Curated annotation (Swiss-Prot):
This is Uncharacterized protein SPAC11D3.20. It comes from the Eukaryota. It comes from Schizosaccharomyces pombe (strain 972 / ATCC 24843) (Fission yeast).
Amino acid sequence: MSFSKFHCGKLMSLKLADLRTMFEALEK
Protein backbone atom coordinates (compact mmCIF):
# COMPACT_ATOMS: atom_id res chain seq x y z
CA MET A 1 0.00 0.00 0.00
CA SER A 2 2.70 2.47 0.97
CA PHE A 3 4.61 1.50 -2.18
CA SER A 4 1.68 2.32 -4.47
CA LYS A 5 1.19 5.61 -2.60
CA PHE A 6 4.86 6.47 -3.11
CA HIS A 7 4.64 5.49 -6.80
CA CYS A 8 1.56 7.68 -7.30
CA GLY A 9 3.28 10.63 -5.64
CA LYS A 10 6.32 10.10 -7.86
CA LEU A 11 4.15 10.12 -11.00
CA MET A 12 2.36 13.27 -9.86
CA SER A 13 5.64 15.10 -9.21
CA LEU A 14 6.88 14.01 -12.65
CA LYS A 15 3.69 15.28 -14.29
CA LEU A 16 4.00 18.62 -12.49
CA ALA A 17 7.61 18.93 -13.67
CA ASP A 18 6.56 18.15 -17.25
CA LEU A 19 3.82 20.79 -17.11
CA ARG A 20 6.29 23.35 -15.75
CA THR A 21 8.78 22.67 -18.55
CA MET A 22 5.96 22.86 -21.11
CA PHE A 23 4.85 26.27 -19.83
CA GLU A 24 8.44 27.52 -19.83
CA ALA A 25 8.84 26.38 -23.45
CA LEU A 26 5.63 28.18 -24.42
CA GLU A 27 6.78 31.41 -22.77
CA LYS A 28 10.04 31.42 -24.73
